[in-house]
Amino acid sequence: MTESPLSAPAPTSNQSPAPEQTFGTAGIAPMDRPSAMTRFFMSIVAWAESLNLKYAKLGNPPVYDTATFPWAAEIEKDYPAIRAELEKVLLRQSELPTFQDISTDVKTISTDTRWKTFFLLGFGVKSEQNIKACPNTWAAVQKIPGLTTAMFSIFEPGKHLPAHRGPYNGVLRLHLGLIVPEPNDKLAIRVDNQVCHWQEGKALIFDDAYEHEAWNHTDKTRVVLFVDFVKPLKSPARFVNWALMNLAIFTPFIKEGLDNHKEWEKKFYAEAEAFRNRPKP
């Protein structure tokens, strides 16, 4: 693997052995008391994860060389247009929901108000109003095969997201640096044993099924375009993964997140409409 400007050097024969993924979500609690249906679904997920490791088309590194994904360069070219739309969104930054406002299971790793979100797509479900507000960003992410989630991820000053593992290894994650304050050594993301630094207009692609943590120890806000997309897999894992991704939306914790976002979206845009229609002085 060639070295990405955002990733740590690839391991050599003198470095630690290749990393191994563990199974099962760590750090994020899907449900306190999962139903029998949810327990059954999670047992299938564990089986699917073992298939995904075995049949991965591009291997299972914690951090990928972005050149492996030709479309990543196209997304980087869209940075100016995406950044311009983000600036408009940030005019109402204080009104944006925290991640745990939308997905309550995230409360196990984030309870403050320093991680805000602006979803365009969550688990394959569109936020039509947010897409309307950011058409260029939406057009850009359409270039990503297997897109499942797209949002602005906003780390306010002092935010530190503790070590955790994502819920499922059937997707990969892209971060496109949009606002990356200085000094660079005060903010980063660690994926397994690799510490990566964001750069504005540059993509970072990693597997969040490895333990990872992120921090912003500067006095300014950091923003990335946060995207999940389907991991390239060979058969039979590809078919199992497709089925699970389509069934996941019916699980209680994902349905709850989608409902929470709909409620926030309704309120957010109702307030904007009321402001536009206010009596003129």
Swiss-Prot record:
In which domain of life is the source organism classified?
Bacteria
Q: Which GO terms describe its cellular component?
A: membrane
Record flagged with keyword Transmembrane? no
Pathway the protein takes part in: Lipid metabolism
Give the enzyme's EC designation.
1.14.11.58
What Pfam families has UniProt attached to this entry?
A: Asp_Arg_Hydrox
Reaction(s) the record says it catalyses: an N(2)-[(3R)-3-(2-saturated-acyloxy)acyl]-L-ornithine lipid + 2-oxoglutarate + O2 = a 2-hydroxyornithine lipid + succinate + CO2
Keywords (alphabetical) are: Dioxygenase, Lipid biosynthesis, Lipid metabolism, Oxidoreductase
The text of the family note is: Belongs to the aspartyl/asparaginyl beta-hydroxylase family.
Q: Report the protein name in the record.
A: Ornithine lipid ester-linked acyl 2-hydroxylase
- Species name: Rhizobium tropici
